[in-house]
Regions:
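Non-catalytic, mostly N-terminal accessory regions of nucleic-acid modification and defense proteins
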Residues: 1-161, 227-238, 340-343, 367-374, ...
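Short, contiguous acidic/charged loop-to-helix segments that flank catalytic cores in large enzymes
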Residues: 25, 258-281, 310-320, 342-347, ...
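Short glycine/proline-enriched turns and hinge-like loops at secondary-structure junctions
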Residues: 28, 166, 240-241, 349-351
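Conserved Class I SAM-dependent methyltransferase catalytic core
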Residues: 30-43, 153, 216, 276-358
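Active-site catalytic pocket residues across diverse enzymes, especially alpha/beta-hydrolases
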Residues: 48, 190-194, 294
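Conserved S-adenosyl-L-methionine
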Residues: 139-249, 253-265, 284, 308-310, ...
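Feature representing long, continuous alpha-helical segments
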Residues: 184, 213, 249-251, 284-288, ...
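Flexible, glycine-/basic-rich loop-and-beta segments that form/coincide
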Residues: 347-446
């Protein structure tokens, strides 16, 4: 990140102070709880004192004409008007320290208040957040996304294509904003790369109380126009009814939402109607939430960059919540690009991660198309690992990825697909079992036959069959078994998928009542499913892939994005002679080493 202000001395001073003063008294993970508030408080005091002295000079003639109480009222009013906060306790940190420990608590409580605009201290605060996050790497992934990932996401949003003009309002939103790093970086990008005169307003939400407070402090110290709400985005939508120009986020992945599922669905307000992912992983809910905040395309539309692990690409079968969410995004032609990032890039996980770029204002040449970018090899090793983070993406590599995205062409790291390339049919089949000679295998099945449907169910042609049918219906006749041919067009034959079968009916008499029990031999059916690419002819596919006689009973459409499959490169196995030769060399080397040790084999 580029900065015009050198903050290294201030950061070093605070960092070293924390190590010198707090060590052995507090755990390292507790340092931020003490340092963050003190940095904020000290900055507030500095701004307040400087503004008070400035106003005293500017209002000297006016103040000299009134009493002390009126002077304080005038000064306090002016300070509130210009810097939006003031401290009327009449104390400073130095005064509180001088007054001794006995009264420090009460004096300190009375003293606390307010935030202000100072870009240098804002950067100091952000840098401290980063350093403490890295030092406490087990916690870092909860609220801190590596800067290079944020930079890549902001570049890929293609904000410059919006031609942001002077004074134009630009809204940026992060529903899982953590310490606010993504929001700050996005604003910097607009001001440094696009238009410094744009009016950028930041919106965010964070569920963790401490992290929310850090985000508030960081953004307020920088003087950002920001609205950060506290609460769970999934059931406490802090931006209800709002729409934004740009959205970016790194929500928790692989995190269960089972405990809050009822509250989420009760407060969805239509956000999650298209489908819900399994309760063990709620990350796709954040995607749907952000989509619900998109501006209509006719009003300029919106762009979203969100980080996911691999699960949202393929988890869930056809008809599942995950598949239906993918279907919703793809069939609306909102998915523009997915970038596979290097592993070991984040602080608390080494797994594969992906940036999804979603927009409802895709340029004409991208409509109906999806770009997959394989950037897993775009990394440099870190000099010192930070938890699971052992790799970084440098500025040159970020620019290479951005260029691949802009070029929008097929190559070693990029592939272009149509929407239906990711669709498939899940076909449910009934397969008829056959013996080794290919003859159908049948099994006896109990069925119900109503007396008033006997004529329709049975195939009666001969006089003998008519006679036996009459005997079967006769309530005064003999009990016994009667065998007939089954009418192939009957409801019973259709239901049990047997057109050429006999039916055995057992007649029983109970007084004046006629009881009928029947059984038929039906083909032995095995249930099966086949997954067929949507663009393939299903009949041709089944004829080629399924040997047994089949009947389609049901179909479902699903979507998955098998990212790694599309970039798989076959590595041929080595020749056996090469392997044998190397084994021989190793055996000779082993023998020499053993001989040197005086061991004869």
């Amino acid at each position: 990140m580029k900065r015009d202000t050198d903050i290294s001395q201030e950061v070093a001073l605070i960092w070293n102070t924390a190590n010198d003063v707090l060590r052995d008294i507090f755990q390292r993970t507790e340092y931020p709880d003490i340092i963050y508030p003190m940095v904020l408080i000290r900055r507030i005091e500095g701004v307040m004192i400087a503004k008070t002295e400035q106003l005293k000079e500017e209002l000297e003639s006016q103040l000299s004409k009134v009493d002390k109480k009126t002077q304080e009222q005038i000064l306090n009013g002016k300070i509130l008007q210009e810097i939006k906060f003031n401290n009327t306790s009449g104390k400073t940190l130095a005064i509180i320290a001088d007054e001794g420990e006995s009264s420090i608590k009460n004096n300190f409580i009375a003293y606390l208040n307010g935030y202000t605009d100072n870009i240098k201290m804002g950067y100091v605060f952000e840098e401290l957040v980063r350093k403490f996050s890295e030092a406490n790497n087990a916690e870092a992934g909860e609220h801190y996304t590596p800067r290079e990932v944020i930079d890549l996401m902001t570049h890929m949003l293609n904000m410059d294509e919006k031609a942001i003009k002077d004074g134009q309002l630009v809204t940026i939103y992060d529903p899982a904003c953590g310490s606010g790093g993504m929001l700050s970086a996005a604003k910097e990008f607009v001001e440094e790369k696009i238009n410094p005169n744009a009016k950028v307003v930041l919106y965010g939400q964070e569920v963790n109380d401490k992290t929310w407070a850090v985000a508030q402090a960081d953004l307020l110290l920088k003087g950002e126009t920001a609205y950060i709400t506290k609460g769970d985005t999934l059931y406490e939508d802090g931006a209800a009814g709002e729409q934004f120009d740009f959205m970016l986020s790194n929500p928790p992945y692989g995190k269960s939402w089972k405990k809050i599922q009822k509250k989420v669905l009760a407060n969805s307000n239509g956000r999650f109607d298209v489908g819900q992912p399994r309760s063990s992983d709620g990350q796709l809910l954040f995607t749907l939430h952000m989509i619900s905040k998109m501006k209509p395309a006719e009003l300029g539309g919106s762009a979203i960059a969100i980080v996911h692990n691999g699960s949202p690409l393929f988890s869930g079968d056809a008809g599942s919540g995950e598949s239906e969410i993918r279907r919703y995004i793809l069939e609306n032609d909102w998915l523009e690009t997915i970038v596979a990032l290097p592993t070991e890039l984040f602080y608390n996980t080494g797994i594969a991660t992906y940036i999804w770029l979603i927009r409802n204002n895709k340029p004409k040449h991208r409509k109906g198309k999806i770009q997959l970018i394989n950037a897993v090899d775009f990394w440099k090793p870190m000099k010192r690992s930070l938890g699971n983070k052992r790799r970084r993406i440098d500025e040159t590599q970020i620019n290479e990825i951005i260029q691949i995205h802009k070029t929008f062409d097929t190559g070693p790291y990029s592939k272009i697909f149509e929407l239906e390339d990711f669709a498939f049919r899940k076909v449910f089949l009934d397969l008829e079992e056959t013996d080794e000679n290919g003859n159908p295998i049948t099994e006896e099945k109990e069925v119900t036959v109503a007396q008033n449907k006997l004529n329709d169910t049975l195939l009666i042609k001969t006089a003998d069959e008519k006679k036996r049918l009459a005997e079967l219906k006769d309530k005064k006749g003999k009990e016994g078994e009667f065998t007939f041919n089954l009418n192939p067009e009957s409801e019973l034959a259709t239901k049990h998928k047997t057109a050429d079968a006999s039916i055995t009916i057992r007649k029983a008499l109970d007084g004046n009542k006629l009881g009928l029990k029947a059984s038929i031999n039906v083909p032995k059916i095995v249930k099966d499913t086949e997954y067929i690419p949507w663009k393939d002819d299903k009949e041709a596919f089944l004829k080629k892939e399924v040997e047994k006689k089949w009947q389609i009973t049901k179909e479902e459409k699903g979507y998955e994005i098998p990212f790694t499959r599309h970039f798989y490169v076959y590595q041929p196995l080595r020749q056996a002679i090469e392997v044998v030769y190397e084994i021989g060399l190793l055996e000779k080397e082993n023998t020499l080493l053993m001989n040197e040790l005086g061991i004869n084999l």
